[in-house]
């Protein structure tokens, strides 16, 4: 099956700023595990010192006053968002299939949606940029399997002002069952049948 790139319509508001999402406090992709810097090393080590997988202890109060103490609430909010439910959602109704994905950290020109072999692939990529801490680049790839029977050429996508990418496609309609038809049976009289057979057996010119 050939690869098809899906164009998406932009629903951005005029005031949208593609660089506003570089500030960690406004992150919406932290819980997706792509598009954000790592947590400080000591936080990663502290989270790993748990009794069993998946256990997370309450955040300790900051031990010192200063920049670190001010930054702690911001990281606490980010961590809380990471542990909450994800923002990638698949919805399917009787006649439509839809995927919603938060791509708030990526500009429209950095996003690509395409279909190939019954799979929708969404990719986003930031080229390497320099900030006050150094160089940073971001990228992600998400793949979703289309329901059976969906026409890849009917897949469409749109980008909302809040940075939510929606990819949807109509589902095939169920096959219409043929209506039952009763065929009437006609009966022929014996006399008609006998006369017809006699006429066929008599050859022309013979007596």
Curated annotation (Swiss-Prot):
Coiled-coil regions listed: none
Region (Interaction with TGFB1I1): 72-207
GO BP: any one term: negative regulation of apoptotic process
Subunit note: Homooligomer. Homodimer; becomes monomeric upon activation. Heterooligomer; with HSPB6. Associates with alpha- and beta-tubulin. Interacts with TGFB1I1. Interacts with CRYAB. Interacts with HSPB8. Interacts with HSPBAP1.
Regions of compositional bias (Polar residues) in chain numbering: 153-163
UniProt keyword Phosphoprotein, yes or no: yes
Modified residues (Phosphoserine): 13, 15, 27, 80, 84-85, 88, 100, 178, 201
Modified residues (Omega-N-methylarginine): 12
A GO molecular-function annotation: unfolded protein binding
UniProt entry tagged with the keyword Aminoacyl-tRNA synthetase: no
Region listing for Disordered, in residue ranges: 151-181
Phosphothreonine modifications at: 176
Function: Small heat shock protein which functions as a molecular chaperone probably maintaining denatured proteins in a folding-competent state. Plays a role in stress resistance and actin organization. Through its molecular chaperone activity may regulate numerous biological processes including the phosphorylation and the axonal transport of neurofilament proteins.
Post-translational modifications reported in the UniProt record: Phosphorylated upon exposure to protein kinase C activators and heat shock. Phosphorylation by MAPKAPK2 and MAPKAPK3 in response to stress dissociates HSPB1 from large small heat-shock protein (sHsps) oligomers and impairs its chaperone activity and ability to protect against oxidative stress effectively. Phosphorylation by MAPKAPK5 in response to PKA stimulation induces F-actin rearrangement.
InterPro entries: A-crystallin/Hsp20_dom (IPR002068), ACD_HspB1 (IPR037876), Alpha-crystallin/sHSP_animal (IPR001436), HSP20-like_chaperone (IPR008978)
Domain (sHSP) ranges: 78-186
Subcellular location: Cytoplasm; Nucleus; Cytoplasm, Cytoskeleton, Spindle
GO (cellular component) term, any one: cytoplasm
Family named by the database record: Belongs to the small heat shock protein (HSP20) family.
Organism (species): Sus scrofa
Listed name of the protein: Heat shock protein beta-1
Gene3D superfamilies per record: 2.60.40.790
Designated gene of the protein: HSPB1
Residue numbers bearing the N6-acetyllysine modification: 125
């Amino acid at each position: 099956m050939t690869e098809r790139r899906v164009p998406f319509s932009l629903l951005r508001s005029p005031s949208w700023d593609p660089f506003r999402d570089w500030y960690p406090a406004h992150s919406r992709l932290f819980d997706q595990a792509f598009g954000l810097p790592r947590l400080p090393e000591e936080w990663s080590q502290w989270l790993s010192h748990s009794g069993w997988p998946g256990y997370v202890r309450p955040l300790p109060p900051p031990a010192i006053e200063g920049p670190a103490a001010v930054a702690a609430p911001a990281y606490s909010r980010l961590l809380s968002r990471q542990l909450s439910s994800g923002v990638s959602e698949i919805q399917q109704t009787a006649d439509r299939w839809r995927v919603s994905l938060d791509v708030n950290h990526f500009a429209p020109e950095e996003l690509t949606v395409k279909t190939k072999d019954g799979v929708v692939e969404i990719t986003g990529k930031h080229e390497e940029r320099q900030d006050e801490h150094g160089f940073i680049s971001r990228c992600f790839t998400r793949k979703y399997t289309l329901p059976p029977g969906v026409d890849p050429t009917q897949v469409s996508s749109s980008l909302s002002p809040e940075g939510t990418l929606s990819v949807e496609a109509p589902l095939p309609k169920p096959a219409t069952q043929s209506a039952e038809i009763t065929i009437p049976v006609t009966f022929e009289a014996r006399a008609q049948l006998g006369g017809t057979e006699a006429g066929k057996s008599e050859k022309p010119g013979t007596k």
